[in-house]
Regions:
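Short beta-strand-to-turn element immediately C-terminal to the catalytic PLP-Schiff-base lysine
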Residues: 2-3, 20
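AMP-binding/adenylate-forming catalytic core of the ANL superfamily
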Residues: 8, 18-21, 25-26, 35, ...
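Noncatalytic, basic helical substrate-engagement surface that gates or grips nucleic-acid strands
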Residues: 31
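General small-molecule cofactor/ligand-binding pocket signal
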Residues: 142-145
Length: 163
């Protein structure tokens, strides 16, 4: 587990998963070398937490991590909380620009059949998330959508939601 400067982190910390060894990932004469090989480590792009027993726990893809007012918020954790609500059929969480906090959590929500978007439902979903995970992680922006953008193979296109 590494921090942003490539220093190893102690157990209990969340950081970038990286591996090193006699073999590994090399991009000779390729710009990707700078992104994926740093300080002698092959950086995976995943964030993990190592518990006190040495077990690794997936937190999020590094590009799915949202930093809001100095807090690190894993988008998938917010998604799991939202998906537990009966009104939510599908959702995706991304960062949205905010003048005060830098970024905030934005949830793009596809409602379950028979459910209707309303300001009351926005508040209900926000309160629901606050009861399940740390309150500072709740989505400050909720956008209701008919469908989430996906590729032909069904993979979510988060980039399209960040605009």
């Amino acid at each position: 587990m590494l921090d942003e400067e490539g220093r190893e982190l102690p157990r209990g910390s969340t950081g970038r998963l990286a591996v090193t060894g006699p073999t590994g990932c090399r991009y000779l004469d390729d710009e990707r070398q700078r992104d994926y090989v740093q300080h002698g480590w092959n950086v995976t792009g995943d964030l993990y937490r190592v518990d006190e027993d040495g077990y690794f726990w997936f937190v999020a893809r590094a590009d799915d991590m949202i930093v809001s007012a100095g807090y690190n918020i894993a988008g998938p954790e917010v998604e799991w909380a939202l998906l537990a609500h009966a009104a939510v059929r599908e959702c995706a969480v991304v960062a949205a620009q905010d003048p005060e906090r830098g970024t905030v959590v934005k949830a793009c929500v596809v409602l379950a059949p028979g459910k209707a978007a309303s300001p009351e439902l926005v508040k209900e979903l926000q309160d629901f998330v606050k009861q399940r995970i740390a309150p500072y992680k709740y989505p400050r922006v909720i956008e209701f959508m008919d469908a989430l953008p996906k590729t032909a193979t069904g993979k979510l296109q988060r980039k399209a939601l960040r605009t």
